[in-house]
């Protein structure tokens, strides 16, 4: 069950990343100063890393809950 939850969340993250890449490609033709583009990309990277860390934390929390449930049975 844990693996399927993790896989679902990972798939959602990948779909979100794909959507962001599409949006980024649509914005590229606009003339934007390089430092603004770099800042936006850095923020997107930080958000993606944060989301992955959250997924790992959630997976660990689910594992601990399952472990506690197994020990009490």
Swiss-Prot record:
InterPro entries documented for this protein: Protein_14_SARS-like
Pfam families: bCoV_Orf14 (PF17635)
Annotated consequence of substituting residue 50 to W: In strain: Delta/B.1.617.2
Keyword Membrane set for record: yes
UniProt keyword terms in alphabetical order: Membrane, Transmembrane, Transmembrane helix
Role this protein plays: May induce apoptosis in cardiomyocytes when overexpressed ex-vivo.
Protein name: Putative ORF9c protein
């Amino acid at each position: 069950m844990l693996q399927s939850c993790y896989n679902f969340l990972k798939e959602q993250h990948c779909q979100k990343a794909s959507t962001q890449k599409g949006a980024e490609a649509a914005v590229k033709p606009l003339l934007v100063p390089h430092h603004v583009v770099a800042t936006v990309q850095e923020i997107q990277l930080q958000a993606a890393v944060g989301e992955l860390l959250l997924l790992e934390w959630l997976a660990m929390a689910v594992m601990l809950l399952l472990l506690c449930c197994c020990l009490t049975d």
